[in-house]
Amino acid sequence: MDKLKKNLDEEKRAKILLYPNKNDYAKTSFINCDTPNANSDHCSVIIVSYKTGSILIECLQSVFLQKSIQQVILVDNGNSRTLMQQMNALADEEPRLEIITGNGNIGFAKACNLGVRRARSEFILLLNPDSIMEVDTIYKSLKVFHSKPNTSVITVKIENPDGSEQRGARRNLMTPWTCVVEQFRLDRLAPNHPYFKRLNLNEAKPLQHISRVQCISGAFMLMPRAVYNSLGGMDEQYFLHVEDVDFCMRIEKSGGIILFVPNIRVMHQKSSSDVYPGFIEWHKAKSFCTYFNKHFHMQYPKWILNIFATTIYFRFAVRLVPTSVSWFWKKIITGV
C-alpha cells in the first residue's frame, strides 16, 4: 500500500481507478436521535465482501484517499485465502483498517449490522466492495449533511464503468404495482401520470441538483450512525438483495429524508463476486417475497401476494437454466 501511495498523486490515481478508459473523467428527529455535530467530519466505512476479486483492493485504495475517514471495517463474509492474506497484510500497514468476520457467509444485512456495531464515528458509510470513489467523495457528501441537518441518508450518482447512471441507484418505492409497471412498461401508456410511475429512474431525466428521492441502492449509503441504529439497522430476514429497499421503505414510513447528490460520483462495477448465479437468484426471489409480505399484507389480499410469490419463483426457475449454463461455460473456458 505504501508503494502505491508513492507512485501516483491523489488526483491522478483516483482518475485512473475510476475511469481507466476515459480521459475526461477523473430530521433525524423523526426517529428521536440527535442531529450529528455540525463540525463532525469523521466517518466509518463498512464494506461487506464475499468472494470479491481484486476490485476490492482498488476499492480500498480509493477509500484510504478520502478525507474524514476514521475507520474502515471490512466484514469478511467468505473471501479466498489469497485475498484475505492481502487484506491482513494491508491491515498491518493501514491502522484504520479493521477486518472482522461472522465466520462464514452470514448474509449482507447481518454483516452490515455486525460492521456498524464496531463503528466509532458519528457517520457511517455502507459501501459495496466493487465501488470506487473519486477523491473527496465523502468530504463533499458530509458537507451536504451539514448544510441539510434534517437529512437521514445521502447517496451520490452511482455510475457504471462506462459513465452511465446505474439501474437501481435511485428509485421510487417498490410496491407490487410499481413492479408491474416496470415489468410491462405500463408507463408508456401515460408517461406523466402518477399512477404509472416506473420503479427505476436511471432512464428518467438526469437530476441536476440535490433532490429528495424515495429509494436508493445499498452500494453507497451515508448516514448518521444514530439514524441506522434508531431504525434497527438492516432487517436480517433478508440474506441477499432487497434489504436496501426495505431500509428505504422504513425511512419513508418514519418520515425520513433521503437525498440524491448528482454532482458527486461513484463507479460501481457490479457482479464482481465469483458466486454461482443460481444462489443469487434464489435469495433474490426469497427477499422479494419477504418484502411484499412484510410491507403490503394490509394493503393487498393474500391471494394477490400469493400470485406475486408464484410469479417471482416462476421467474427464478425460468432464469436458472440459462444463467447456470452461462456460468459453468465461463468456468470451463477460463479454467477457473
Positions of PLM-derived features:
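Active-site-adjacent helix/loop segment of glycosyltransferases
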Residues: 249-327
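Short aromatic/hydrophobic "clamp" motif used to bind/position activated sugar donors
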Residues: 124
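Short, acidic, metal-binding catalytic loop of nucleotide-sugar glycosyltransferases
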Residues: 61-70
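Conserved donor NDP-sugar-binding/catalytic core segment of glycosyltransferases
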Residues: 135-168
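Glycine-rich, basic loop-to-helix element that forms the pyrophosphate-binding segment
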Residues: 101-119, 140
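A short, conserved alpha-helix in the catalytic core of glycosyltransferases
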Residues: 206-233, 237-265
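Short, flexible, basic/aromatic active-site loop/helix in glycosyltransferases
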Residues: 173-213
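A conserved acidic beta->alpha catalytic loop
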Residues: 62, 76-87, 104
